[in-house]
Amino acid sequence: MALIPMMTAYENVEFVLRLAGYKGDRRKRTEECLKLVGLGSRMHHMPQELSGGEQQRVAIARAIAHKPKIIFADEPTAELDSNTGLQVMKIFKELIEKQGVTIVMTTHDTGLMEIADCIYHIEDGEIADED
């Protein structure tokens, strides 16, 4: 999901918490999530001031902010360099193992497959096989 262009990275994450009716400290949770994805120093930047990879990480922070039980992620590491992609993979793995979050994702990144419990290969819009 695209970021709201007239809101800072911080505001993009905090807005979702307001919409979800988050009962905790929204400021603290917003800052935690942005720091978790390595953007603590960029939280007051507008989306157009962020690289594609940084924007992707803001979207991930926004997705995890309200502590969902399930996350749908379409190519979550697509615009990230390999080191940042590994960082995102670690975050997802921790969410799965420590918080019991289910993550359903599409990806071409075979590295992400190592955290998967179930893998479906799709060819021409059809499930070709299951691992």
Question: What are the residue ranges of the model-derived segments?
Answer:
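Catalytic Walker B motif of ABC-type/P-loop ATPase nucleotide-binding domains
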Residues: I71-D74
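Short coil-to-helix segment of the ABC ATPase nucleotide-binding domain corresponding to the Q-loop/switch region
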Residues: M7-E14
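Conserved ABC ATPase signature
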Residues: M46-Q56
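Helix N-cap at the start of a conserved alpha-helix in ABC-type nucleotide-binding domains
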Residues: S82-T84
